[in-house]
Amino acid sequence: RARVIHSLCTCSQLHFSEETKQVLRLSLTEFSLPKFYLLFGISKVKSAAVIAFRSSYRDRSFSPGSYERETFALTSLETVTEALLEIMEACMRDIPTCKWLDQWTELAQKFAFQYNPSLQPRALVVFGCISKRVSHGQIKQIIRILSKGLESCLKGPDNYNSQVLIEATVIALTKLQPLLNKDSPMHKALFWVAMAVLELDEVNLYSAGTALLEQNLHTLDSLRVFNDKSPEEVFMEIRRPLEWHCKQMDHFVGLNFNSNFNFALVGPGP
């Protein structure tokens, strides 16, 4: 990534403003710091030169890693993607006909909705981070992927990949909800998606589930959904078509939203 930024800084065919060049120089410095190596899973590196001349195939492990390592990779991917997006948008301001972001988004969407245990989770996260618009249908597709991940998680034995896929869909939904049309019924339904993830009682998914719940409440509050109705009234109303499924989840974790909404809301957790 640092080499790509360096190429942009030195390319004579691209003419950037001083402001853009400053963004590129600062980004190049930041990407050369040890903290950014860690985001790529690279540790114990003393300088940029060390990693530049290290063989990309040396010390590569093909054994399955722990889920903690994969969780780190997905959350790190958010940071890296947002940093690259900032660089791309700075460059695009000086290139009016530039289609870089459109092409990136198109590729991310293609792999996000295509089954591939290695690429799909990462593509979902990237798609969520870089998208500038989202449709009701795309959100439904992501929820279907989440549903398939849940089914695989319950059936096993590939619990590891299933949890990674679940986390990726939740991260994508968290990023995309603010882009949804304000009249979309998905806004309220995503509350129960977040609660379902939390009710799984998987410590590795708790952070992602909590982030989706927080984003959901902030978004609904900004849309003034709670001006005339309490959160309990809003969410229990949208729950009715899903009552049979929701009750099964509630029974599994020993909660009851019908009898005590507030207590049940704070109940799920690791």
Curated annotation (Swiss-Prot):
<keyword id="KW-0539">Nucleus</keyword>
<comment type="function">
    <text>Stimulates the GTPase activity of Ras. NF1 shows greater affinity for Ras GAP, but lower specific activity. May be a regulator of Ras activity.</text>
</comment>
<keyword id="KW-0343">GTPase activation</keyword>
<protein>
    <recommendedName>
        <fullName>Neurofibromin</fullName>
    </recommendedName>
</protein>
<dbReference type="GO" id="GO:0048147">
    <property type="term" value="P:negative regulation of fibroblast proliferation"/>
</dbReference>
<dbReference type="GO" id="GO:0005096">
    <property type="term" value="F:GTPase activator activity"/>
</dbReference>
<dbReference type="GO" id="GO:0005730">
    <property type="term" value="C:nucleolus"/>
</dbReference>
